[in-house]
């Protein structure tokens, strides 16, 4: 199943943007409009406007997702990051990283420590998570809808310095393009994101919450609007 001409969970926060004034369903922002236009172009060409990113931050995120799952997640979790869920009626799909019986989850591995610290600080409450990290929040809401789960959770991770040697060895076991992760094996410690133990931040940070029904409904309505605009244009 392709993501071409589908509004995807990873970018769905753009559809929740607002224009000037208070938020309302009709008051869409510039990111909403540009994202819809991007999907119109994809529908007209049959190819994605933004192909898989080969930059190191993206590669690090994909690679570490598998490492975190195999080394730091409980046995109850299933890694499903290669399975795409599709809405039955709308141009809408998503790929959560993890599943439990009642929840979807995502594993995030920021490439910069500044980003890591900011993202972890946003987990102080559900309200701060939603306002400070909307791209993560709405991705979880979207995946919860598509996978029909009541709860959502996110894991924000950075390795400890003494884990970097094991991470380099893991490149040989990586279930993906070995050429893309080869640089991790020869990178110095200073070139890889990491923190030290016994300081303020810990390696794996987590929040789990019941997805508000109101937010499910609002997001669904915005995707309906976007799908209608897409269908009219093609």
What are these regions (language model features)?
Residues 76-96, 100-222:
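Nucleic-acid nuclease catalytic cores
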